[in-house]
């Protein structure tokens, strides 16, 4: 295995996914690409607990604008790279339905392993694209490592009151 692609979102469980995927990649001496798929930004909370140095969305930008969404996503991925301490990590912001864009980029980049988490914005995501993790597992021709959600982090996330952006 020469290329490991780690797919994360803004969920606090993303830290465990990124760290686990990175540990596998380093053990395999593989290249790493960390990706985030942009779907409708209105499904993401503006009050997430800090994730790997990313403290949340700037409220300055019009998040109906894809360029602002991409900029914020790259800021998030930069925080992840700093957290992991490896400037050689590639980052990529993908557009479209989460599972589809992750699978397309994995093929394009010729990834040998896709690392994803079990926790997503399921209640909202299911309305539009079904569960991304199960879709990736069913449709991938590439090996997939699924990292279980950190129960402690999930508990903290559920206790926090979320405010969702409204457009």
Spans of model-derived segments:
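Small/aliphatic-rich secondary-structure junction motif
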Residues: 2-59, 163-167
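Active-site phosphate/pyrophosphate- and oxyanion-stabilizing loops and adjacent acidic/basic residues
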Residues: 19-22, 78, 134
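Short helix-capping segments at alpha-helix termini
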Residues: 27, 82-87
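A short acidic, glycine-rich active-site loop
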Residues: 55-72
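Rossmann-fold cofactor-recognition segment
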Residues: 89-91
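Charged docking surfaces used in two-component/phosphorelay signaling
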Residues: 93-101
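Gly/Ser-rich helix-loop-strand patches that form or flank binding pockets
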Residues: 104-156, 164-165
């Amino acid at each position: 295995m020469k290329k490991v692609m780690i797919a994360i979102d803004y969920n606090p469980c993303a830290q465990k996914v990124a760290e686990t995927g990175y540990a596998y990649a380093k053990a395999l001496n593989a290249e790493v690409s960390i990706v985030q798929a942009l779907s409708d930004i209105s499904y993401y909370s503006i009050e997430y607990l800090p994730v790997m140095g990313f403290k949340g969305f700037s409220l300055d930008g019009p998040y109906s604008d894809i360029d602002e969404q991409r900029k914020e996503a790259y800021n998030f991925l930069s925080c992840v790279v700093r957290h992991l301490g490896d400037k050689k990590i590639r980052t990529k912001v993908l557009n479209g339905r989460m599972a589809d864009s992750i699978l397309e980029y994995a093929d394009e980049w010729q990834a040998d392993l896709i690392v994803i988490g079990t926790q997503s914005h399921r209640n909202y995501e299911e309305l539009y694209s079904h569960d991304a993790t199960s879709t990736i597992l069913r449709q991938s021709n590439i090996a997939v490592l699924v990292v279980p959600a950190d129960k402690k982090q999930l508990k903290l996330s559920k206790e926090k009151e979320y405010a969702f952006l409204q457009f």
